[in-house]
């Protein structure tokens, strides 16, 4: 059983075994949803108990934007792929270009907020991840993009563990 606290106890005596599939985490603000995802992804450590974090291919996405300002969306995507040692196939590139409404050559600095968040989300299409943790990022993009992401995640649910936090009602279809 693990525990995690800050000024107050966020998670106490939790024990989880999570199978492959898609899971939605719900709760009030400050209830520990983000902390739980960070612990599971290995980005935070438990205060007490055994640490049973994942050690395979993990994608963790939150509301932080991942881009570098002077580059295009495509150049930023290449930087991310290089950091994860991902080689994109022609089909992957085409799917990602469609995800960006064929605007992958646009400058990251002038892109909309939703497009900037799509940069991290596009990694969902780049690889078959063992674990995907999505913390609120889905609420920042348009309905068409959510539909594309939902279809991709549903296609991965037999081989991946996908856990997401979202207040966007469009995402209820994932479960």
What are these regions (language model features)?
Residues 23, 34-43:
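Short, conserved post-Walker A segment of ABC-type ATPase nucleotide-binding domains
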Residues 136-137, 142:
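Walker B catalytic motif
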Residues 26-28:
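The feature captures the beta-strand-to-loop junction immediately N-terminal to the Walker
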């Amino acid at each position: 059983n693990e525990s995690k606290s800050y000024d107050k106890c966020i998670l106490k005596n939790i024990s989880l075994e999570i199978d492959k599939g898609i899971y939605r985490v719900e709760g009030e603000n400050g209830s520990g949803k983000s902390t739980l995802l960070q612990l599971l992804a290995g980005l935070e450590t438990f205060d007490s108990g055994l640490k049973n974090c994942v050690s395979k291919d993990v994608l963790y996405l939150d509301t932080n934007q991942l881009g570098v300002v002077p580059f295009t969306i495509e150049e930023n995507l290449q930087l991310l792929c290089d950091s994860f040692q991902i080689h994109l196939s022609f089909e992957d590139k085409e799917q990602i270009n469609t995800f960006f409404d064929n605007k992958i050559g646009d400058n990251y600095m002038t892109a909309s907020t939703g497009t900037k968040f799509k940069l991290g989300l596009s990694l969902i299409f780049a690889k078959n991840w063992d674990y995907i943790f999505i913390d609120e990022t889905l609420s920042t993009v348009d309905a068409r993009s959510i539909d594309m992401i939902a279809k991709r995640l549903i296609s991965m649910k037999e081989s991946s563990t996908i856990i997401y936090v979202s207040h966007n009602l469009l995402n209820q279809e994932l479960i």
